[in-house]
Amino acid sequence: LRTWLHPNCFAAAPLVAKGCERAFWAAFLVWADTNGGPALFAHLPEMPVDGALAAALRAEAAAQGRRIELVYREERALLDSDLAPADYLEQAVRGKKRKELRRQHARLSEEGKLKLERYDDDRCLATWIDHFLALEAAGWKGAAGSALAAHDATTGLFRDALRGAAERGRLERLSLTLDGRPVAMLANFITPPGAFSYKTAFDERFARFSPGVLLQLENLALLEHDTIAWCDSCAAADHPMIDGLWTERRAIGRYSVAIGGAAKRAAFDRLVGAELSRSPRGIGD
């Protein structure tokens, strides 16, 4: 038994009203006990390890005498600082690398008219989405069959998610264009007090200029956003690009929680104990 997680989503924490966390978990665990079927436990993937929701889960499980284990944990890049963008960049990236990025920006500018575009509304949204999907599909993800445009379902998810966010004033889009053609694009979901950097793509023909990194430098403007305290990169742990720019980390984990009667819970104890003893990071996939 597990909570739902779409392959193109990077957080699976249930959406719970502030102050209702304990009540939610109490109701969920009762439901899981009676509706779990043959499942030995409830598996909760992609959960933030810190915060009120996880704390309430642990507290409610303890109050019910129910075993819960964090069976996997990783840390991914997070932007969380009171510094201004320029000051943050200076402390996050060594001087030699900053000099190289300035050189790449200058060289890319020599290829044509370089322009940054930033939108926080639905202007040109349909065209922007088309350009993003084409840009991503033209790269290695397209060759691997993992681009959003490779499947109707993921294309639809992306279009619907961005349209819905834009309608609610929750979408920010950035593009770096060269002579009007996008060479790097990214989409942020703005969800005060946090944000999520959902998807990014770049033109691999210009890889020597690192357009994706150059666009992420512009994305540091999130630090000056009035309602945003942090931004989750939504990237894999140890990501070779964003880990070098965003120095804070967000712990994400997978919890397993005992459900059902005594027999199920005894079997879960044996299973989770064996798995945790084999893996220092917990149970993998």
Language model regions located:
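A conserved beta-strand-loop-helix scaffold within acyl/acetyltransferase catalytic domains
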Residues: 1-4, 45-208
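Acyl-donor binding region in acyl/amide transferases
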Residues: 1-72, 189-257
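Short helix-loop capping/hinge motifs at secondary-structure junctions, enriched
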Residues: 20-23, 84-86, 262-264
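Short intrinsically disordered coil segments
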Residues: 29, 91-98, 269-277
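Low-complexity, flexible helical/coil segments
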Residues: 77-82, 114-116, 151-157, 209-213, ...
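C-terminal catalytic domain of photolyase/cryptochrome flavoproteins
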Residues: 149, 172, 226-229, 234-285
